[in-house]
Regions:
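Conserved acidic residues
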Residues: 54-55, 145, 172
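Pre-active-site segment of Zn-dependent metallo-hydrolases
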Residues: 23-59, 66-77, 81, 97-109, ...
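Short secondary-structure boundary segments
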Residues: 61, 151, 177-179
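Metallo-beta-lactamase
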Residues: 69-119, 202-223
């Protein structure tokens, strides 16, 4: 897949849906669906989704607000919960080992940052990243079209650290996740803290009043931009 072809490649059916918390569902042009970090309702406070026709699920770590595969109704899906390279259903997936805390995993264990490439676009989901990325990790992630990053602190990087990660990466679209909302039971910081940090670096910010982003050729901005989506649940 050639990165520089992304502006010319048709993606009429490609969508990214934010269900809630850190859970996203990516559908490629072929109609295959990749789910990331499905949550359990009783842990998070969000309504629990019931999903069918999921082809791949990525769990960044084993905590049940990120690894509740019981929400998937069909039995025949591929589960990825370890570091490595995987290819299936039009998705090329690389999972990069990181930590859930800033003490090399001694507090909360390991975490996977996932790179998903499909239909000429590269997506990066940071899971419950607990530390700022090192130079080698940044290099390994490469160019990113859409970044999903936790910003609420407490269990993950906070707003300031998230802004630092964004600054270090070559990214076009930034989608904050894992922050305090009306439904969320965790004592996380609100997304506004992250937006204030991004304004300091003069990033454009858009309130995207939908849970589904249609990833056609006109969606990808030429300059990095923050999109605050509305979750489905």
């Amino acid at each position: 897949i050639l990165y520089n072809n992304l502006e010319r490649k048709g993606r009429e059916n490609m969508t990214l849906e934010w269900l809630a918390h850190s859970c996203f569902c990516l559908a490629n042009e072929e109609g295959h669906r990749l789910l990331i970090d499905p949550y359990r309702g009783e842990d998070t406070g969000y309504k629990e989704p019931q999903l069918d026709k999921v082809d791949v699920v990525i769990c960044s770590h084993g905590h049940m607000d990120h690894a509740n595969t019981a929400v998937i109704q069909n039995p025949d899906y591929m589960k990825i919960d370890k570091a490595g390279h995987f290819e299936t259903k039009g998705f090329a997936i690389d999972t990069v080992p990181t930590y859930h805390d800033d003490e090399n995993g001694t507090k909360r264990g390991e975490n996977l940052v996932s790179i998903v490439e499909t239909d000429g676009l590269r997506f990066c989901h940071c899971g419950d990243l607990g530390h700022v990325l090192g130079k080698e990790q940044v290099k390994a992630l490469g160019k990113i079209d859409v970044l999903m990053i936790p910003v609420g602190g407490l269990f993950t990087i906070d707003a300031k650290q998230a802004a630092e990660v964004v600054e270090a990466l070559d990214v076009k679209i930034v989608i904050p996740m894992h922050y305090k909302t009306e439904a969320c039971r965790y004592d996380l910081a609100p997304v506004e803290d992250f937006l204030e940090e991004m304004k300091k670096s003069e990033y454009a910010i858009s309130m995207y009043h939908d849970s589904v982003m249609h990833l056609d050729g006109y969606t990808i901005p030429k300059r990095a931009k923050v999109y605050v989506m509305e979750s489905k649940y």
